[in-house]
Amino acid sequence: MSIPKSTPDRRVTRVMGVDPGLTRCGVGVVEGGLGSSLKLIAVGVIRTPADLDHAHRLLRIHDGLEEWRDHTRPDAIAVEKVFAQHNRNTVAGTAQAAGIAMMIAARHGLPVALHTPSEVKAAISGSGRADKAQVGFMVARVLRLSAPPKPADAADAVALAICHLWRGGAARRIEAAVATQRRGRRVPRSWKDLAR
C-alpha cells in the first residue's frame, strides 16, 4: 500500500481515524477547519494474515500505523471505542489494535480521542443506528467522493476522523467561550462570534 506523503495546512486540523481490528485495521485521514470544507487526505486498510502469530500481527499493525502517521502527519488521532462482543478473541484483538493506535498518539504527543460507534454514526448520518451502507454513503457525500471508501473498515475510519473534526471543533469553541467568560470578557452569543 502506498500512503501519499503530505504536509498539513496549519489553518486546518488533520485527524487520523482508526477503526481498529486485527485482520483489517481501517485508517482514514481527513482535514478541515472553521469555514472550510472537509478534505480526504488518504484512506486504506492495514491487513494482517490470520496464519501469522498474534504478536507479529500486532507488530504489523504498529508498523503500519506508524507509517501512516509519518506520511500524513495528523494533528490528532481518533479511535473507535471498543465494546465487548460475543467473540472474546475478536474483541481482544480489536482492543489491542486500539491500544496500539493510542500508544502511537501518546508517543508523538498527539491528542487521542475515543468515539463510540453510535457517536460516529450520529455525527455522520444523524442517527446512532445507521448501518454501514448509510455511513459509507454519508462519508462519500460529505467528502464529495464518487463512492464510499472500500472496504467498510476504511469508510468507518474516515467517519471517525470526520466525527472528531466536527465534535472536537465544537468542544474547542465551547472551551474558548468558557475561557473568555473567566477572563471577564463578554461571552459570544453565537458560534459566529467565536470565529472572530
UniProtKB/Swiss-Prot annotation:
User: In the record's cofactor note, how is the cofactor described as bound?
Assistant: Binds 2 Mg(2+) ion per subunit.
Which cofactor(s) are needed, names only? Mg(2+)
Q: Name one GO molecular function term.
A: DNA binding
Q: What is its EC number?
A: 3.1.21.10
Indicate which residues the UniProt annotation says bind Mg(2+) 2. Answer: 80
Q: Which reaction does it catalyse?
A: Endonucleolytic cleavage at a junction such as a reciprocal single-stranded crossover between two homologous DNA duplexes (Holliday junction)
* Protein name as annotated: Crossover junction endodeoxyribonuclease RuvC
- Organism of provenance: Cutibacterium acnes (strain DSM 16379 / KPA171202)
